[in-house]
């Protein structure tokens, strides 16, 4: 079980690292040039003052700028959402595998449990079947015996 939890931690760290890397790669400063007024505005410089005519030019991006910066896939558009979805998928797979190993370990005897105790079965015994069926006389009786494999 310790091995499974170590694998879970390693997978989660790997996914978190990939998410941080993809987010860092897509966070770039955007620079807008207005050739009509000769004013350059950088997103990192907040002290740039723009005249009213260039503010209107900056608010409407040209078609070439939109095409040049448009992402081509969902992972380019939403890197954080992609990383979170990947994390959820990995966590779901790990949970399913750990649940399956837990169920499997309960079905088989453990190494520490003596095999004789497993073969003897539990202390709860099935009640004996009644000799006479509680069904009325005109209803046919179907009796099924289920063998118990030990």
Curated annotation (Swiss-Prot):
GO terms for cellular component: host cell membrane; membrane. The chain crosses the membrane at residues 83-103. It holds the Pfam family HCMV_UL124. The keyword Signal applies. Residues 27-54, 108-138 are annotated as: Disordered. Its main location: host cell. Residues 1-20 form the signal peptide. Keywords: Host membrane, Membrane, Signal, Transmembrane, Transmembrane helix. It is a single-pass membrane protein. Belongs to the HHV-5 UL124 protein family. This is Uncharacterized protein UL124. It comes from Human cytomegalovirus (strain Merlin) (HHV-5). The lineage of its organism: Viruses, Duplodnaviria, Heunggongvirae, Peploviricota, Herviviricetes.
């Amino acid at each position: 079980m310790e091995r499974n939890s170590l694998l879970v931690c390693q997978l989660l760290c790997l996914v978190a690292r990939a998410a941080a890397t993809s987010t860092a790669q897509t966070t770039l400063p955007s620079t807008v040039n207005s050739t009509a007024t000769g004013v350059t505005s950088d997103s990192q410089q907040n002290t740039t003052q723009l005249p009213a005519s260039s503010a209107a030019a900056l608010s409407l991006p040209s078609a070439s700028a939109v095409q040049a910066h448009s992402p081509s896939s969902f992972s380019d558009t939403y890197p954080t959402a992609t990383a979170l979805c990947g994390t959820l998928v990995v966590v779901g797979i790990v949970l399913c595998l750990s649940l399956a190993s837990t169920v499997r370990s309960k079905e088989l005897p453990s190494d520490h449990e003596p095999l004789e105790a497993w073969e003897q079965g539990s202390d709860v015994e099935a009640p004996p079947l009644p000799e006479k069926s509680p069904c009325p006389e005109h209803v046919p009786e179907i009796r099924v015996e289920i063998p118990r494999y030990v």
